[in-house]
Amino acid sequence: GYLLRHKKSGARIALLSNEDENKVFYIGFKTPPADSTGVAHILEHSVLEGSKEFPVKDPFIELVKGSMNTFLNAMTYPDKTMYPVASCNDKDFANLMHVYMDAVFYPDIYKQPNIFYQEGWHYEMENASDELKLNGVVYNEMKGAFSSPDDVLDREIVRNLFPDTVYANESGGDPDVIPNLTYEQFLDFHRKYYHPANSYIYLYGNMDMVERLNWMDEHYLSHFEKIDVEANISLQEPFAAPREAVKPYSITENEPLEHNTYLTCSMTAGDVLNREEYIAFQILDYALCSSQGAPLKQALLDAGIGEDIYSDYDNGTRQPYFSIVAKNADASRKEEFLRIIDETLEKLVAEGLDQKRLQAGLNYYEFKYREADYGIFPAGLMYGLQVMDSWLY
């Protein structure tokens, strides 16, 4: 593999040349949100609504219908936005690259304000007597996301662990805040972050890499001069003492209030740039909580703290974090939940972890990475997403 920098524009490029015919390309941008208007998410939707060389209403839908792609999507993360495609056909792959590069650098959003109103938010009323109501693709999508207890929990964990960083903001957009976003702010976000100097381009598979690099240079990258893009993602300063947060969430009329609380204990876990820690925490997660009869999970289940106990090691942010969650628990048992976690971990520190369980974790992850079976997703795509876990920082 090669890591390159385009001299004129400053674009970062990663090349993984191999025999895999399922070729993958993505272009990503560091997009730290300054608020919860969801501007990064709305922009992700909007750039795929037509561009300079592809002025059709919805090129994304045209590609879904007419391309031989093995993957086609765009994703907004807490601090980055990514546009990946994959195909086994050389001509199709080149076309997908063309559509996506044109979309991110020359979208129709500057000529067609209605793209913003359609994808972001707008007021509408059918008749003069009707009540004025809010609508918009991202607005409605995030209303759905904010009604899911699991999504609410994930969001609150990140917001409370990293209150002084960009992660305190909702990159997808908070439905209560999305209507604060103006069209001009939306365009400013594109002008600031969608520049090659702030881009991460990834090519994987069996292709003529030199030809692809020359094509990108000639058609797009050479049209831009390198600039400094301020997109710093700061680290959260450690707290002086553990903090507590309570977040209500809505339930249906038929759901009981009892045994319907989520209890979680979350902590930052090392540095995403430390590869050994990154792997060690995955194995620790397996040994402590994820595997059958894992000691931390078992201790909480034996105490009847919740109907389900699960853990999550998330390394998709500047600082990875580890969470232990008790689902369908009682709020009154919060102190007991924390005490069992502390006592179990202290005991494991004193007596050591079961070597067989650790070895099983090592074997599990070694097999997983060697097998590289990602189901419907191309292996090259999953490698590329993993690359961004550290490349971005």
PLM region spans:
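Short pre-active-site segment immediately N-terminal to the catalytic Zn-binding motif
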Residues: 28-38
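Short acidic-hydrophobic surface loop/beta-edge motif
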Residues: 2-7, 243-253
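Secondary-structure transition/turn motif
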Residues: 7-8, 19, 30-32, 88-89
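Short, conserved catalytic-motif segment at the N-terminal edge
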Residues: 21-25
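Ordered hydrophobic segments in well-structured contexts
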Residues: 3, 14-15, 26, 262-264, ...
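Active-site recognition of the HExxH zinc-binding catalytic motif
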Residues: 37-49
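N- or domain-start disorder-to-order transition segments that initiate the globular core
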Residues: 1-20
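Charge-rich, well-structured scaffold segments of protease-associated domains
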Residues: 32, 46-240, 253-280, 286-393
